[in-house]
Amino acid sequence: MEVYCHFKVDTGMGRIGFSVRSDFEAAIAAMERCAALPKLHFSGIFQHFAVADSTTPENEAYTQAQHALFERTVQRLQADGVALHTIHCANSAAQMRHPEWHHSLTRAGIILYGLDPSPEVHFDGLRPTMTLKSVVEFVKDLLPGESVSYGRTYTANTPRKVATVCVGYADGYPRALSGSNGNPNAGVMSIRGKPAPIIGRVCMDQTLVDVTDIPDVKMNDEVTVFGPENAAIGADTADSIAAKTGTINYEIICGISRRVPRVYLRDGAPVRIWNDLEET
């Protein structure tokens, strides 16, 4: 069997690859031995930046050093007769901040979702593309003194109207967004264009929200769990959820589980629906 592949070099990420930063000559020799194997066909080379999404002087210097070492590696292999047709190193942050490093191709990640790579790196013109939606499955009145969900972390002080939404941590919605009395980091969804704050703990398949101030909420109403600010009035965004839960926006969008159907839109109209439960 013949295998077509690219070299992966470690210039400072410290994850995988030929470690050109530890012993340059040994790494070059190892790659050239691999390139001589008859069943392996190396047509490209790549590396990954560790801190391209940081603008501090120290981290910018580290990123520059990574790229310089990568170029040195490429030039040496080419000088030794190794044909490298595809050269790539730029992730989302490097792609936007250093267009001179695009080489043969770039590896866009978070910017495909229209999100910034980090809080300190902002690109004008990006528009968030992903919205997580669900529906109301139950509406009820909550009397003063009554509690909801596991742990009884929320108890009504006044009469409230509560909606149960079909989404939970098994869908990738963080349990850390659970609402208790006075929790400032509770999640917020949007129903009928108005904010619906979470009350009680997020369950595996369901989450409860306060809809007291939203008139006429009923079963099967559409719920925006999170999405772009202009499309989800009052609801969390991927960035705000990341801030509330102490993580990054990457984890929020990548964490949506396989059981959530994906609806792909073009000009606002669905062009494909992918449902893993039906596909398998």
What is each PLM-predicted segment?
Residues 143-280:
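C-terminal accessory subdomain/extension
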Residues 1-4, 11-143, 215, 273:
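Active-site loop/helix belt of alpha/beta enzymes
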Residues 9-11, 256:
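Generic hydrophobic/packing signal
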Residues 6, 30-33, 94, 100-101, ...:
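Short, flexible coil/linker segments at or flanking structured domains
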